[in-house]
Amino acid sequence: GGTDSYWTRDYGPWWVVDGNREIGIVDFTYNRPRPNDNDAPTKVSNYLDTPYFATDVITAGGNYMTDGYGISASTTLVYEENSMSNNQVHQEMLDYYGVHTYHTLEDPNDEYIDHIDCWGKFLSPQKVLIREVPTSHDQYEEIEEVADYFENIVNAYGEPWEIFRVYTP
């Protein structure tokens, strides 16, 4: 079936593997008024005859990154979009995505869509890419705080993250 937009990262399915190594699709409620986009994960699941699980979390894929080993991150927009408590959001992430460590950070860009993919990306279970701006940039301090945050936490292997910066003036 058709969709309403081309933002597949925002509304597409998230694949999970359970303890029996069985693959399924987890579907969040898409945070935009685009019903055909919101239905895309169900359509993919039906087409591929893949198990489907729906979570009550409202979000967009652009505000979610995961290392594939139980560590994920989003901006605090995920709390603002949901009527459930922050603890309930974390529990849904654990129950449906296997996320035992969920980092939720203030959006350092503080503009537009507040998606984490506007300034950060897990490149692997050990590497994270963070936006870098000149010291004269309005959000310089906030972006550096995010980089410092990741420099002071550990990855799934219990090691410091390897931080890569991309200059985006």
What do the PLM-derived regions correspond to, one by one?
Residues 1-169:
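The feature marks the mature, well-folded catalytic cores of soluble enzymes
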